[in-house]
């Protein structure tokens, strides 16, 4: 029996020792688990922050208003609570997945990247995946909160749940790490990507021809255009500045008065309102603190606003102003003349007229720098020869236009027979149709100015001359004060404030620069039938360095590289040697103003 009891006591001792060892193991595991939780918590926060930032980055890249290329610093500015390193890491991850194409650049002193192109479909898929992961994490957090709210008497269940959650988190993090390693590009992929980026950089650089074309259309000597002031005269501009200064000072004074009154009101409320020392008192204290902070912010804003207003009002207006022309017979109470500088009776008109108020402090004799000197020396094309203005005084009804050769662009402002008194003669519809315009072009463009009832006649003439109407320009007329004309001299039922220019095409013209200009010209009205000078710039940009001719031109229409024809020009001036020889053969006496001279020239040509 003694042996049996000894065996039993040994077994109990062993069991107690095993229990003690198990308890010690559990204590060690618990201590280690607490340490691991403390270490893993910041990592989880970083992962969650990365997911949120990645979601915002994907939303910013998939937006329709994104302008490419864009630098990573600009993406950081759009996303609150993000750093440049985090955004660069996310962009590199997206580039490895093939959603975007980036290029490494240096932004100031920091290294960054530039987004060149975006794949919308892949970005959409990645955004959906990130949204799903965010939703899963939110659901897990809700479940944990629900579990924490329930009172659990046993500590073992809490420890088991924490261990399970740790295992799940580690099991979730493990495949992410594996996917990260798999998505990392290899050295071969990096080399091929670098080669592709270098090729793309070479392709995006402008060529020498593109740079020369851009240099060609720059203004000689830089931009010399001044903006008109919206207030009109200098007096009105100063009045407006004083009014804004007074308003700013008034607002500043009102804010100061409110700031002085608010402390008294708050003190009175504290004396009369006896609040017990409870949570409500703390809330009132918080509200009072917020009110004081708001007052300080408003006072700071008012000081800033007053400084800006004072700086704005003290600055002089650098825009262009007008000056009233006050004569002995002018009556200012009548107001402005509706025709302004186009008034035919300015010497006796009692209404107010204007002239540009020149600025005496502007130095017109500025030394030209090297860039402007180089821009003045540039030419258009070595292959084409440019000539100074050329013109022929002639009657277009009788001129033999085959002598002139072929042109790339034709512009015509015909004297249409409209029901209106004009300072020049007009042509009938049949005479317009019989003009020799088809001989001027085989392939090219025509710009035909039309007005009133001549719009339909102009379309008929284009068809008859062999053109197809492809576009239309509109000239919106403004007066001297840069306002839209409301009392025009044309129009039977409504005052016309615009004119139309039909654009026709013949054949298949080449070397046209499409899409450079708009089809609307907003320009000031000058003399009768004086078209805006902007049309010449539009035509030159559309077809640079080519032969151009203008029909029914006047002395103010002569332009370099243009031949102008009209009966109001001063004689004949030709520079092109080929054109001179052809014209002298056809018109030896140089007279092409009458049908008799044209017939005599044709008879002489037949006899020779």
Swiss-Prot record:
Residues 483-496 are annotated as: Positively charged region required for RNA-binding. InterPro entries: MT-A70, MT-A70-like, SAM-dependent_MTases_sf. It is found in: Nucleus. Residues 250-265 have a biased composition (Basic and acidic residues). The keyword RNA-binding applies. Its EC number is 2.1.1.348. The keyword Cell membrane does not apply. Disruption phenotype: Flies have a reduced lifespan and exhibit multiple behavioral defects: flight and locomotion are severely affected and they spend more time grooming. They also display a mild held-out wing appearance resulting from failure to fold their wings together over the dorsal surface of the thorax and abdomen. RNAi-mediated knockdown results in semi lethality and reduced fertility due to the presence of compound egg chambers with supernumerary nurse cells in the ovaries. Keywords: Differentiation, Methyltransferase, mRNA processing, mRNA splicing, Nucleus, RNA-binding, S-adenosyl-L-methionine, Sexual differentiation, Transferase. It comes from the Eukaryota. Residues 480-497 are annotated as: Interphase loop. Pfam families: MT-A70 (PF05063). Its main location: nucleus. SUPFAM superfamilies: S-adenosyl-L-methionine-dependent methyltransferases (SSF53335). GO terms for molecular function: mRNA m(6)A methyltransferase activity; RNA binding. GO terms for biological process: female sex determination; follicle cell of egg chamber development; germarium-derived female germ-line cyst encapsulation; mRNA modification; mRNA processing; regulation of alternative mRNA splicing, via spliceosome; RNA methylation; RNA splicing. Component of the WMM complex, a N6-methyltransferase complex composed of a catalytic subcomplex, named MAC, and of an associated subcomplex, named MACOM. The MAC subcomplex is composed of Ime4/Mettl3 and Mettl14. The MACOM subcomplex is composed of fl(2)d, Flacc/Xio, Hakai, vir, and, in some cases of nito. Gate loop 1 and gate loop 2 regions are adjacent to the S-adenosyl-L-homocysteine-binding site and display large conformational changes upon ligand-binding. They may play an important role in adenosine recognition. The interface loop contributes to the heterodimer interaction. This is N(6)-adenosine-methyltransferase MT-A70-like protein.
């Amino acid at each position: 029996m003694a042996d049996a009891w000894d065996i039993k006591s040994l077994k109990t001792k062993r069991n107690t020792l095993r229990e003690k060892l198990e308890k010690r193991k559990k204590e060690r595991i618990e201590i280690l688990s607490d340490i691991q939780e403390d270490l893993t918590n910041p990592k989880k926060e970083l992962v969650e922050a990365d997911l949120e930032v990645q979601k915002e980055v994907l939303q910013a890249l998939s937006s329709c208003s994104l302008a490419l290329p864009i630098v990573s610093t600009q993406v950081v500015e759009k996303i609150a609570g993000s750093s440049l390193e985090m955004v660069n890491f996310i962009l590199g991850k997206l580039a490895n997945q093939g959603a975007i194409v980036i290029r490494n650049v240096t932004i100031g002193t920091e290294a960054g990247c530039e987004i060149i192109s975006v794949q919308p479909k892949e970005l959409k898929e990645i955004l959906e995946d990130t949204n799903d992961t965010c939703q899963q994490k939110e659901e897990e957090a809700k479940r944990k909160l629900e579990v924490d709210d329930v009172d659990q008497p046993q500590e073992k269940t809490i420890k088991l749940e924490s261990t399970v959650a740790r295992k799940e988190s580690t099991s979730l993090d493990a495949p992410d790490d594996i996917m990260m390693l798999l998505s990392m590009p290899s050295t071969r992929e990096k080399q091929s990507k670098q080669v592709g980026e270098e090729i793309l950089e070479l392709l995006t650089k402008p060529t020498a021809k593109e740079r020369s074309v851009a240099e060609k259309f720059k203004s000689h000597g830089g931009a010399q255009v001044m903006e008109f002031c919206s207030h009109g005269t200098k007096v009105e501009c100063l009045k407006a500045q004083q009014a804004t200064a007074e308003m700013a000072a008034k607002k500043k004074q009102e804010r100061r008065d409110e700031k002085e009154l608010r402390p008294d009101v708050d003190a009175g409320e504290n004396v009369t309102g006896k609040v017990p020392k409870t949570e409500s008192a703390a809330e009132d204290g918080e509200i009072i603190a917020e009110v004081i902070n708001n007052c300080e912010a408003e006072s700071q804003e008012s000081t800033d606003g007053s400084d800006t207003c004072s700086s704005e009002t003290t600055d002089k207006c650098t825009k262009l102003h007008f000056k009233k022309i006050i004569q002995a017979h002018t009556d200012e109470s009548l107001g402005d003349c509706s025709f302004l500088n186009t008034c035919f009776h300015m010497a006796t008109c009692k209404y107010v007229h204007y002239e540009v108020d020149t600025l005496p402090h502007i130095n017109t004799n500025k030394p030209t720098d090297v860039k402007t000197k180089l821009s003045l020396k540039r030419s258009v094309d070595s292959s084409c020869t440019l000539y100074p203005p050329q013109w022929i005084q002639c009657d277009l009804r009788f001129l033999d236009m085959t002598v002139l050769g072929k042109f790339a662009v034709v512009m015509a402002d015909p004297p249409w027979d409209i029901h209106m008194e004009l300072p020049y003669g007009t042509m009938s519809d049949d005479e317009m149709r019989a003009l020799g315009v088809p001989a001027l072009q085989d392939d090219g463009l025509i710009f035909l100015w039309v007005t009133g009832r001549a719009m339909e006649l102009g379309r008929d003439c284009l068809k008859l001359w062999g053109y197809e109407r492809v576009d239309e320009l509109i000239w919106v007329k403004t007066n001297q004060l840069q306002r839209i004309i409301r009392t025009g001299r044309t129009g039977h039922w409504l005052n016309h404030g615009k004119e139309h220019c039909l654009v026709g095409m013949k054949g298949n013209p080449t070397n046209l620069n499409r899409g450079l200009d708009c089809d609307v010209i907003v320009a000031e009205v000058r003399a009768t039938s004086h078209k805006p000078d902007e049309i010449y710039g539009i035509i030159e940009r559309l077809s640079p360095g080519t032969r151009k001719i203008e029909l029914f031109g006047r002395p103010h229409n002569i332009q370099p590289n243009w031949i102008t024809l009209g009966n109001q020009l001063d004689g004949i001036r030709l520079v092109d040697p080929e054109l001179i020889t052809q014209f002298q053969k056809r018109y030896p006496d140089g007279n092409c103003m009458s049908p008799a001279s044209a017939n005599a020239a044709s008879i002489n040509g037949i006899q020779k």
